[in-house]
């Protein structure tokens, strides 16, 4: 629908709001969570999943034509053209290691500072973050 337009870029607004922050963060809209017991027993599978997830994100960025057709085929959106138009504004990214920890801890701190209940009343310690084998 050509009459639709973007009125607010949330990623840009977040970045602008973070310019003066003590700990800069990025807008985080999706994470992978793994139980510590599962990670200890199946770390190789977790690393394989993360590597394939990173490759999927790279593919989506590098080949939006094919990615949008797959998005339509999976029923995520009804038309590939809609997916292709939307992809550049989705801020799809893969972060791991220290980059992920910095971005996510800053994001959680920004939420906590506004309303501690939004993070369960506390900020997670270093054990919360998996900064293992996958690197981007």
Per-range role (PLM):
Residues 65-136:
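An extracytoplasmic/periplasmic, membrane-proximal ligand-sensing/linker region
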Residues 1-70:
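Pocket-lining segment of extracytoplasmic ligand-binding domains
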């Amino acid at each position: 629908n050509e009459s639709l337009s973007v009125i607010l870029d949330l990623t840009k607004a977040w970045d602008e709001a973070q310019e003066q922050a003590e700990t800069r963060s990025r807008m985080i809209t999706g994470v992978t969570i793994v139980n510590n017991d599962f990670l200890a027993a199946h770390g190789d599978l977790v690393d394989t999943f993360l590597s394939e997830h990173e490759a999927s994100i790279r593919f989506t960025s590098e080949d939006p034509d094919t990615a949008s057709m797959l998005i339509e085929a999976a029923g995520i959106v009804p038309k590939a053209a809609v997916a292709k138009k939307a992809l550049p504004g989705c801020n799809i990214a893969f972060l791991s290691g220290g980059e992920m920890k910095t971005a996510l801890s800053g994001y959680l701190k920004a939420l906590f500072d506004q309303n501690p209940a939004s993070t369960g009343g506390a900020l997670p310690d270093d054990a919360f973050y998996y900064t293992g084998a996958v690197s981007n």
